[in-house]
UniProtKB/Swiss-Prot annotation:
InterPro entries according to UniProt: Cytidylyl_trans, KdsB, Nucleotide-diphossugar_trans
Protein name: 3-deoxy-manno-octulosonate cytidylyltransferase
Species assigned in the record: Pseudomonas entomophila (strain L48)
Chief place of localization: cytoplasm
Biological process, per Gene Ontology: CMP-keto-3-deoxy-D-manno-octulosonic acid biosynthetic process; lipopolysaccharide biosynthetic process
Amino acid sequence: MSLDFTVVIPARLRSTRLPGKPLLPIAGKPMVQHVWEQARRSGASRVVIATDDASIVEACRAFGAEVLLTRADHESGTDRLAEVAAQLGLAPDAIVVNVQGDEPLIPPVIIDQVAANLADHPEAGIATLAEPIHEPETIFNPNAVKVVSDKHGLALTFSRAPLPWARDAFAKDRSQLPVGVPYRRHIGMYAYRVGFLQDFVAWGPCWLEQTESLEQLRALWHGVRIHVADAIEAPAVGVDTPEDLERVRRLLEA
């Protein structure tokens, strides 16, 4: 039996590094349309774009997407998802997958994977994905979020800092990956149950979340388990900078 889940794609017009990001053209389409099309290729029963901007609503309706206008004052993307789930009237046990609106090359198969992982791990309130880190510079890049899990695949913590800190290895050489340390980069895709989203909003931000600017730390702070699996297909580059945009344009326009 196929798994029933809803994909929500948050799309905000304001971006400090790349203004107007969701509507930037790539191969003749706005970026958010590419994300929507990839999500539609997954097993999701419904794909919804959530935005706080009327121009994005208009653009999304033009290419046939279901789109909802949300409040503009949400603390995080997860808070926005909670509003969408309420607008859609989803049941507390329904599964919602958050697919970032700046991932025009997101593999549909990992959207299915993260939804299935949550369904298969009832002890977890959230499921998410990671991939191995192979380049030493990625460990020290604050834009690459690192995750460490326990032996059961449950997250111990996430950080923008090098995590774990290989004290002896880094004291000698930071240009090589420490031997025997499985560094992993977090992939910013989440599956939630709607009931959890309601709790998440009620808690409000915690100091650790605000310090790292990582909303998933709010869940860990409140004792929620996060299941982390290695993605079965590595995602291509997301779009955070003008350089990322040009790279994706070259890939899709080739």
